[in-house]
Amino acid sequence: MSNVCIIAWVYGRVQGVGFHYTTQHEAQRLGLTGYAKNMDDGSVEVVACGDAAQVEKLIKWLKEGGPRSARVDKILTEPHSPRETLTGFSIRY
């Protein structure tokens, strides 16, 4: 088991449709730590840390569009080294 952290920016109809709440639920189900945060440009920023296979499952879920009410047009991901220790998976404002 190797642990990784990624940061992702999800673009499309992803705000006001419960996207960050369902992302939190999915990340918790996968045993990941991190957060989801609405950004000023209409995207959602997601930081996810944990087992590499579980992080990949979250990325796949994000690419597939998350909740039914959302529409994902584009997702960008890159490795990430959080400055703080992340516990649990939260929604940030």
Swiss-Prot record:
It catalyses: an acyl phosphate + H2O = a carboxylate + phosphate + H(+). The active site is at 38. InterPro entries: Acylphosphatase (IPR020456), Acylphosphatase-like_dom (IPR001792), Acylphosphatase-like_dom_sf (IPR036046), Acylphosphatase_bac (IPR028627), Acylphosphatase_CS (IPR017968). PANTHER family: ACYLPHOSPHATASE. Disulfide bonds join 5-49. Residues 5-93 form the Acylphosphatase-like domain. This is Acylphosphatase. The lineage of its organism: Bacteria, Pseudomonadati, Pseudomonadota, Gammaproteobacteria, Enterobacterales. Belongs to the acylphosphatase family. Signal peptide: none annotated. GO terms for molecular function: acylphosphatase activity. The keyword Hydrolase applies. Keywords: Disulfide bond, Hydrolase. It is an enzyme of class 3 (hydrolase). Its EC number is 3.6.1.7. NCBIfam families: PRK14426.1. It holds the Pfam family Acylphosphatase.
